[in-house]
Structure formats: structure tokens, C-alpha cells
């Protein structure tokens, strides 16, 4: 059986890119590896297919093995981590040793290191100087925010390696300013891959898939559904020689999707429900307040994450205790005693109360049993009541999200459900 160092693959079979992330802290679960996800998205933008992601610890032998294997099956290897002045920053030396290439000290890196040092000292420590050593013949990818530069190097035919530090902000800046341009100028970018994401609420993934079954079998562009708590995403992805070509492929599919689903589609790409609600209220020059009992301020939190939210959001009351509902929102004790805190009658009274208290156009209230305790046969865990009160709108409704959900899931579903109904109510008011 051949070892990894003896593996040979015909260069014609080599294709695409792979990602290698280095760091024992990733393997141990101490930090989340967001770099791979981000790089994968950037490769897609450049039209570079990628088929493998690997994580290894700070071990020279395993690193050399991983680099050799990648060089025999892929055209491009992108690495993160393992760069810097500390003893476990071993990547550059291992890469050079793997391809039997000497390291050379780069004066331009030394000058940059001195300029970035706090006191601009002329003498650098040996650990700092280590960062100026790169394989002979490699191009430098400058690090604008940190000290450890990356390299762009083709140590063998039909194979290029790019190295980056593990700090996400440094990686992203180096990629945007230099690495992506190097990939394009060296003809490593094959085609353009463009995507458009549509967001849906108030519909399950299976029901949505049934409605768009004929689109899901499309080859270019491809159409795929992805479910998350309370919402569904549909990603349309097209390949072509230019972004103009891919956009022309995507547009008719996007148009058909929105025609089929109507108001179930609430946003595109990075748009969120709260942003859509914010824009709708801002356009109408109207305001809102919230009264929350089981969501712990989750609705208000979503709305106030948006810059400029004070233009539409006046405030809210988080009323878990019944006496707070009575004192701050004016909910009659008789209604609570007769119908219970989790009831349509109580949420309607809460919405009316917060609308008056904050002098707003719109009010939304919620009261439910998020669990894991507190449920009963008539009012189980997962039961949530809502109310929306607008200028000419009064809607109360009940949802049962199920007792098998976690407290966090029930709260999240309640927030998303409330925001989506609010979105629809404002649209209908128009």
C-alpha cells in the first residue's frame, strides 16, 4: 500500500480547490471555524469549484501529509492558521520543507514588521523575524491589519498554495485586496458562480418544495431549499462566463418563485423580517411598541438591532408577572382570572394597553408557555397567543409550536411568527 507521499495522480484529474485549516484550538472545539465557510463562499463567487475541507492540529508531520495529499488531487490549496511569531506557527516552514525549497528572508516584510511595531524599533526579536521567512520564489500576500503575511506560491506544476493567518478579519482583508486578484490574474478563476437567496415565512419546507417541484430539477441554475427555525430559504445558483450571464439565468426563476408563493416570500439575500417591517413602517411614517410575556423582549430586540430603529420603535413592556400586566398595561384582573394569562383576551388587552401607553400606531403583544414547565392539558407547553393592533387592524391568533421544542426554539418561533404577521398586517393596511 502506498503512503501519502507516494500517491501520484495524473494532473489531468486534478481539479478545483480545497481548504486546509490549521489549529489545535479548532480541533478541540475551543473556537468555531468560520474561515472555511467564508472562503467557500468566495471561491463560489470566483467560479472556482471546491470539494474538500480539512482541519488538522499544529503537528508538522500531519501538516506535511495533508499538503502533499492536496497537491496530488487539487489545483489550489488555501490554508488558514499556523502563521505568526509563536512556536506553534509552523506552516510556512513545513510548506517549504514539503517541496524541498529553502526559506528566504524578505526585507520588505522586515520593514513592514518594524513599521507595525509599537515603538518602531530597528531590532526585531527572533520570533518576529520568523514571519519574514518565505519559500524562495513565493509571492507575498500583504497583511494590512496584522503582522503575519501570506504567500501565493506554485511549488509544482498545476498546483498553487495560498496561505493566510487564522484571524478572520485579517483573512478577509487580504483576500479582498490581493488574493482574489491573484487567483483571477493567474487564470485560476474558471467561471462566474452567482447566487440569489429568497426567504420565506409561514410555509414549511415540504409544502414549498411541492409548489416548486418543477424548479428543483433545474440544472443551471440549480434551485435548492433550506429550512431553519421558523423560515425557509431557497437558493438559486447559476454558472456562466460573466455575472451578466448568470444574472440573466437567475432572474426568470426568481420571478416565477415569487409569483408562485406570493406574500410568503419576504426578502432577498441578507434581508431579515425585522428589516422588512422597519422599512414598511418607515415608509408609512408609523410607529410601534411591544408587550411581551413569553419572548423576553425578543421582538423588541430584533427591531432595535436595525440602525435608526428609534424612528419607528417607541418602546415596550416585558410583562411576565400578572401584576405588571395589570399595572403597566391596564389588563383587567378579571380577564386574567377568567381566561388565564395565556389567552386571546389577555394579549388583546396587552396590545391595546401598550398602544395607548406609548402613543403608537401599531402594537404587538405575545403571551405563551415556553416551557419546559408550566404547561397543562388545556394549555400545553408551546401554546402561544398573539395580538396585533393597528390604526384599523385588530388580529388575535393562537399557535401551538409543540411541547417537544426547546424553550429557546419556542421563543424564536414566536418572535418570527409575530414579525411575519406584523409584516402582512402592514402590507394589507396599505
Curated annotation (Swiss-Prot):
One short Pfam name that applies is CinA
Task: Give the family from UniProt.
Answer: Belongs to the CinA family.
Q: Give TM regions.
A: none
PANTHER family according to UniProt: NICOTINAMIDE-NUCLEOTIDE AMIDOHYDROLASE PNCC, NMN AMIDOHYDROLASE-LIKE PROTEIN YFAY
Which SUPFAM superfamilies does this chain map to? CinA-like (SSF142433), Molybdenum cofactor biosynthesis proteins (SSF53218)
Domain of life (superkingdom): Bacteria
Under what name is this protein listed?
A: CinA-like protein
Amino acid at each position: 500500500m502506498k503512503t501519502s507521499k507516494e500517491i501520484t495522480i495524473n494532473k489531468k484529474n486534478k481539479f478545483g480547490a480545497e481548504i486546509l485549516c490549521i489549529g489545535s484550538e479548532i480541533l478541540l472545539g475551543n473556537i468555531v471555524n468560520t474561515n472555511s465557510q467564508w472562503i467557500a463562499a468566495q471561491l463560489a463567487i470566483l467560479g472556482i469549484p471546491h470539494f474538500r475541507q480539512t482541519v488538522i492540529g499544529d503537528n508538522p508531520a500531519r501538516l506535511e501529509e495533508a499538503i502533499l495529499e492536496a497537491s496530488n488531487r487539487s489545483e489550489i490549496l488555501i490554508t488558514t492558521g499556523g502563521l505568526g511569531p509563536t512556536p506553534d506557527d509552523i506552516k510556512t516552514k513545513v510548506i517549504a520543507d514539503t517541496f524541498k525549497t529553502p526559506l528566504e528572508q524578505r526585507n520588505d516584510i522586515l520593514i513592514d514588521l518594524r513599521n507595525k511595531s509599537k515603538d518602531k524599533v530597528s531590532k526585531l526579536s527572533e520570533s518576529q523575524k520568523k514571519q519574514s521567512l518565505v519559500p524562495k520564489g513565493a509571492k507575498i500576500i500583504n497583511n494590512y491589519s496584522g503582522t503575519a503575511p501570506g504567500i501565493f506560491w506554485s511549488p509544482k506544476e498545476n498546483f498553487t498554495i495560498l496561505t493566510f493567518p487564522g484571524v478572520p478579519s485579517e483573512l478577509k482583508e487580504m483576500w479582498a485586496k490581493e488574493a482574489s486578484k491573484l487567483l483571477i490574474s493567474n487564470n485560476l478563476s474558471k467561471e462566474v458562480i452567482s447566487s440569489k437567496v429568497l426567504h420565506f415565512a409561514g410555509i414549511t419546507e415540504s409544502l414549498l418544495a411541492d409548489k416548486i417541484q418543477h424548479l428543483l430539477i433545474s440544472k443551471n441554475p440549480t434551485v435548492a431549499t433550506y429550512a431553519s427555525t421558523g423560515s425557509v430559504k431557497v437558493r438559486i445558483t447559476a454558472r456562466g462566463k460573466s455575472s451578466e450571464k448568470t444574472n440573466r439565468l437567475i432572474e426568470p426563476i426568481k420571478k416565477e418563485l415569487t409569483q408562485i408563493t406570493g406574500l410568503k416570500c419576504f426578502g432577498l439575500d441578507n434581508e431579515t423580517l425585522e428589516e422588512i417591517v422597519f422599512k414598511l413602517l418607515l415608509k408609512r411614517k408609523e410607529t410601534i411598541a411591544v408587550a411581551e410575556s413569553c419572548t423576553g423582549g425578543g421582538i423588541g430586540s430584533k427591531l432595535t438591532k436595525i440602525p435608526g430603529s428609534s424612528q419607528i420603535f417607541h418602546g415596550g413592556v416585558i410583562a411576565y408577572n400578572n401584576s405588571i400586566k395589570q399595572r403597566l398595561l391596564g389588563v383587567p384582573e378579571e380577564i386574567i382570572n377568567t381566561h388565564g394569562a395565556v389567552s386571546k383576551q389577555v394579549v388583546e388587552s396587552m396590545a391595546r394597553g401598550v398602544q395607548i401607553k406609548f402613543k403608537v400606531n401599531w402594537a404587538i403583544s405575545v403571551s405563551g408557555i415556553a416551557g419546559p414547565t408550566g404547561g397543562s392539558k388545556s394549555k400545553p407547553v408551546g401554546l402561544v397567543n398573539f395580538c396585533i393592533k393597528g390604526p384599523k387592524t385588530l388580529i388575535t391568533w393562537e399557535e401551538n409550536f409543540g411541547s417537544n421544542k426547546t424553550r429557546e426554539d419556542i421563543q424564536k418561533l414566536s418572535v418570527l411568527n409575530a414579525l411575519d404577521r406584523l409584516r402582512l398586517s402592514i402590507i394589507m393596511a396599505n
